[in-house]
From Swiss-Prot:
Entry-linked PANTHER family: ATP-DEPENDENT RNA HELICASE DBP3 (PTHR47958)
Stretches with biased composition (Basic and acidic residues): 1-20
SMART domains per the UniProt record, alphabetical: DEXDc, HELICc
Gene Ontology CC terms: nucleolus; preribosome, large subunit precursor
Basic residues: bias regions: 21-50
This protein's domain notes: The Q motif is unique to and characteristic of the DEAD box family of RNA helicases and controls ATP binding and hydrolysis.
Gene expressing this chain: DBP3
Domain called Helicase C-terminal: residue spans: 351-500
Bias kind Low complexity: ranges: 67-77
Protein name stated in the entry: ATP-dependent RNA helicase DBP3
Extent of motif Q motif: 117-143
Catalytic activity line of the entry: ATP + H2O = ADP + phosphate + H(+)
Annotated organism of origin: Vanderwaltozyma polyspora (strain ATCC 22028 / DSM 70294 / BCRC 21397 / CBS 2163 / NBRC 10782 / NRRL Y-8283 / UCD 57-17)
Cellular localisation: Nucleus, Nucleolus
Amino acid sequence: MSKDEIKDKKRKSEEYEVVDKKKHKKDKKDKKEKKDKKEKKLKKDKKDKKDKKETKSESESNEDNESVASVSTSSTVDGYTENADLLKVPQSEIDEFFTTNEVAVEDESKLNLRPLLSFSHISLDSRIQAEISKFPKPTPIQAVSWPYLLAGKDVIGVAETGSGKTFAFGVPAINNILTKSGSKPGKNGIQVLIISPTRELASQIYDNLVILTDKVGLECCCVYGGVPKDEQRTQLKRSQVVVATPGRLLDLIQEGAANLSNVNYLVLDEADRMLEKGFEEDIKNIIRETKSTGRQTLMFTATWPKEVRELASTFMNSPIKVSIGNTDELSANKRITQIVEVIDPFKKERKLLELLKKYQSGSKKDDKVLIFALYKKEAARVERNLNYNGYKVSAIHGDLSQQQRTNALDEFKTGRSSILLATDVAARGLDIPNVKTVINLTFPLTVEDYVHRIGRTGRAGKTGTAHTLFTEQEKHLAGSLVNVLNGAGQPVPEELKKFGTHTKKKEHSAYGAFYKDVDMTKKAKKITFD
C-alpha cells in the first residue's frame, strides 16, 4: 500500500470517527431529550391526576357544604335550631294550622320558621320547659312568635286578649337572660323591661312572670304609681325583669333609681292603649335609656291601628309581624254572643237589675258578671245602688286607691264576689278567668273600646255573652257598631239601624281623621331621642 493510500485511509478513518462521534453525540442528545420529554409527560400526567383529584375532592366538599347549608337555612337561624320532629311534620299540617287559626306572618327576611305545634318542639331551660308543659299546647300567638323571638328578631304580635300574649313574650325573655348570662344572671342588672299602660295590667303580667322567674332564680318586680316608691327603689336594684307603667318608671329613672343601660329585651304591651293615654313622649324617653344596639324590641297588642305603626318604625329593626285573626279591621271575638238593646237612658239602671236576675239566676247564681260604666262618678253611684239591692259588688274606678282596686280584682278573681263594676281602666288586657257575661251599662266613647270591653269574656277558647245598652246619645257610633256586629255574624236590631249606618273615621286629637299609611316593610330609621 502506497504512502498516499495509507494517508487517504487514515483520513477517511478519522472522518468516520468524527461522524460516529457526531452520531453518538446526536443519539445521546436525542435519547436525553426523549427521556426528558418522557419525564415531563410523567410529571404532567401526575400533576393533572393530582389536580383532578383535588378538584373532585373540592367539588365533593362544596356539595357537602351546600347540602349542610341547605339544611341550616331551613333549620337554624341565629342560634335557634328547628326541632327535628317539627321538620318532619307534613307541610299540609302546617298550612292547616295557619288557616284554622287565621295566622298571618309578614316577614321580609323570608325566614319561614315553622310554628311550634307542641311544647316538645321547643328546647328551653328545663325549669321553664317543665312549667309551660303544664298547658296542653302553645297558643297560636306563642306557637308562631316563639321561633322568631328565640332567633333574636324584633316581633310585632297582634292577637286578641286572652290569647297567651304574656307567655308569648315572657318565656323567650327569661330564657334569653339564662342563655346570655350563664351561671350568674343576677350580675347584669335589669335586662328585660316590659312597659304596660295600666297598673292593673302591669300587676297581671307580673303575677304570670313571677311564676317563671321564681323557678329559675331570677328577680322580677312591678313598678307603678299610686303606691310608695321606697320599696320599688329597693326592688329595682336587685331585679333582672321589670314590669312597669310609663309614668312611675320615668319618675324613678329621673331620680337615678332605675338603670336601664343593660336592657336588651324591651316589650311594649298594649302599645295602642299607651298612645291613647298620651304616653308617647314617656315611651321615647324610656327607650333612650336602654341599649341603642343589640336590643330586641317587641310589641304585643290586641289591635294594630295605623297610629301605632309610625312609632314602631322609629325603633324596631325589620320586625316580623305575627297576626292572629283579622286585626287590621276592627273585629270582635266570634265566640261572644252580642246582644244590643236600644233603650231610654233613664231606664238603664232599672234594666241592669233585670239583667243581673237573668244572668245570675238558678244554677248561674255564681257566674261572674263584669259591668262597665263610662265615668267613675257613674260607677260609684251604680255600686251604691247595687249594694242597696243586696248584691255584693267589687269595683275598680279612679276614685279608689290602688290597694282598694287590687283587693276588688282579687275578690272577683277568687269568687268572693261574682260582680265586678269597672270603668274602662279594666277594659284592656286584664286576664280575669271565667267571666260569663259582660254588661255595657253605658256605651264607651269608641267602638274600639267596645270591642276590648266585651273581650273580657269568651277568652282562651271559651264562649261568653255581651249585653249592651245603647241610647240615642251614642247614635254617632251606631254605624261602627253595626259593622262589628255584622263582622262577627251577630244580629243587628232594627232600632239600631234607624240611627243610620254611616261610619265616622276615628279621629286623632292632633291629626284629625287623616292618617299616613306606614309601610312596615321599610327598614327602621335609626333615630336618637334628645
